[in-house]
């Protein structure tokens, strides 16, 4: 009954193809490239943020990842797939064998197209997800940042942050708890231990509560080993939680603060830059204090001089003690983790991520 509706007669006598045929053809072209075409549970890869130029970001990502991927794992090899015979004379008369061979050739060609790095739809603007096969994303990204940190050589213009994603699951609290119980074991289960922090970011998702996610993940880490402690200054491990739509991306990274929150634009900057910035801010602070002291001496009011210092410290970027009051009411290390997640989300927004 549906076949006549798909092809309708036009005034010129021709036939118009139904929409279903175009949809199937488009879907077939996507599947022909091999592998998933969008971010989904069960993938490993690298989440990359950029600034309004995703196509250029993908090009830079391929170039950078292939360069360091070949250095760590060697170049990709497809000789086995390319040298497979295209036909067999002895099996031409056997229909069943010919069918099996055709299916095998299709599978082989699909596997050949599954490259080491493949861009997929992330589900968010200014975010690119590169699916990886046969490598460990956290080691590769750490190797890239370590080299850029040492050489101070800038290799990208569009890429902002590059976060390895070791696992993905559904972005529902129960699914995340179940997945994290086994995912976090290699780093935090006894006898393994370490200091940690949790960095949380959510995009295009409104059904997951930040404080609940951080509280549950922190509880899992402490349950795996009671000696795991929170350190927001220089943690040994940073648990990265990136939620996009209905997919939760997880990873555990090292040197998160040393490598400037895995920001490729910041990690190549000389250490002199922040010190100079702090010195400039300090000079401004001293100038303000001097002017305040002079005004206080003229007005003979000593109380105003004591109130000037907290205002300047807030201008230098320190957090206010009264922020996030709901999280502060909760005990233990969880309020610290929640405040860290707040700082992490703000920094991500500043990076156009």
UniProtKB/Swiss-Prot annotation:
Keywords: Acetylation, Disease variant, Intellectual disability, Phosphoprotein. Residues 1-10, 273-282, 297-327 have a biased composition (Polar residues). The modification N-acetylalanine is found at residue 2. InterPro entries: THUMP_dom, THUMPD1-like. It comes from the Eukaryota. GO terms for cellular component: nucleoplasm. Coiled coil: none annotated. The modification Phosphoserine is found at residues 86, 88, 119, 270. Residues 1-20, 73-96, 270-353 are annotated as: Disordered. Residues 147-254 form the THUMP domain. The modification Phosphothreonine is found at residue 79. GO terms for biological process: tRNA modification. One of its GO terms (molecular function) is RNA binding. Residues 283-296 have a biased composition (Basic and acidic residues). Interacts with NAT10. Binds tRNA. Belongs to the THUMPD1 family. PANTHER family: THUMP DOMAIN CONTAINING PROTEIN 1-RELATED, THUMP DOMAIN-CONTAINING PROTEIN 1. Functions as a tRNA-binding adapter to mediate NAT10-dependent tRNA acetylation modifying cytidine to N4-acetylcytidine (ac4C). It is linked to Neurodevelopmental disorder with speech delay and variable ocular anomalies: An autosomal recessive disorder characterized by global developmental delay, speech delay, moderate to severe intellectual deficiency, behavioral abnormalities such as angry outbursts, facial dysmorphism, and ophthalmological abnormalities. Brain imaging is usually normal, but abnormalities of the corpus callosum have been reported. This is THUMP domain-containing protein 1. The gene is THUMPD1.
